[in-house]
Regions:
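Structural alpha-beta junctions
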Residues: 112-120, 164-176
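Well-ordered, non-membrane alpha-helical segments in soluble/globular domains
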Residues: 101-110, 158-169
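A conserved beta-strand-loop-helix scaffold within acyl/acetyltransferase catalytic domains
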Residues: 20-83, 128-131, 157, 161-162, ...
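Short, intrinsically disordered terminal tails adjacent to the first/last structured region
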Residues: 1-12
Length: 270
């Protein structure tokens, strides 16, 4: 289990001095190429996610050090009712080298850019880890009546780089969103990660991955296997779209059973 930096927001200020880094609009091809060159990035920062969020206006922007592209962001703009003012939102981003980039340069440049686009405020979701808990520790905490929330457990690991980012964001005037039940106004603050590699980087086989799960998870996976549940990859967009209705039907039944509001089929067609 990992805790990430909370979604943070800022009322867009008027810049007092030019930022060394420059932010400007880029095309989707440049955006995708930059993401492909990185070790990892959230799908919420891909141009395709902007097309999914059709009710928001989308923009791909790049962070430039001179003419060198050092980071990108998908910015979503949501207009306030009856006025031409927008909230800018960067889900799971921006995509930067958070441990290396000068945030005092990059973030004011981003704020200035969205302000010029009519935004009154901006919300970002720094993809940095601040703390980790082991699966066993979480399991023990669930069984302990004195543990009411994950924060009551001392983490097995604290990430100094993530903590440094959080501190710098506060110093720059960014404010964390209040999380309720592990969720803030944006993406989950706490995420469970299943390791697929050992500490030394060796890939784990299926048995080793299952061993890291609790008994209930292992039982459910074995039950699905016995019932003939199969996972298949679609060959191309047309085949995927043809199977989408079957998925959506199952999804709607799940929503009815678990009492949550399902997305329409159109939401999954990008």
């Amino acid at each position: 289990m990992a805790a990430r930096a909370a979604v943070t927001s800022l009322t867009v200020p008027t810049p007092t001095r030019p930022a060394p880094l420059q932010v400007r609009e880029i095309d989707e091809a440049t955006h995708r190429e930059h993401l492909a060159a990185r070790a990892s990035a959230s799908f919420l920062q891909t141009p395709g996610w902007g097309r999914v969020k059709a009710e928001w206006r989308r923009e791909s922007v790049g962070f430039f050090d001179g003419e060198s592209l050092v980071g990108v962001a998908l910015v979503l703009y949501r207009q306030l009712p009856k006025v031409k003012r927008f909230l800018a939102y960067v889900p799971e981003g921006p995509v930067l080298d958070w441990g290396e980039v000068d945030l005092a340069s990059a973030l004011p440049a981003l704020a200035a850019h969205v302000k010029a686009r009519g935004a009154f405020g901006i919300r970002i979701g720094p993809p940095v880890v601040t703390a980790r808990w082991s699966a066993q520790q979480v399991k023990d905490g669930i069984a302990d009546d004195d543990v009411r929330r994950l924060g009551d457990l001392a983490p097995t690991e604290r990430d100094t780089a993530g903590a440094r980012v959080v501190t710098q964001l506060r110093e720059l005037g960014w404010r964390p969103q209040v999380a309720e039940g592990g969720f803030a106004a944006g993406q989950p603050q706490f995420v469970f990660q299943v390791p697929l590699r050992d500490a030394d980087g060796t890939a784990l086989d299926e048995d080793a991955v299952l061993k890291g799960m609790n008994q209930l998870w292992r039982r459910n996976i074995k039950k699905a296997d016995k019932l003939g549940v199969e996972v298949t990859a679609s060959e191309g967009r047309e085949e995927a779209l043809a199977r989408l209705e079957d998925f959506h039907d199952l999804y709607v039944h799940t929503a009815e059973r678990d009492h949550f509001t399902p997305r329409p089929l159109s939401y999954f067609r990008v």
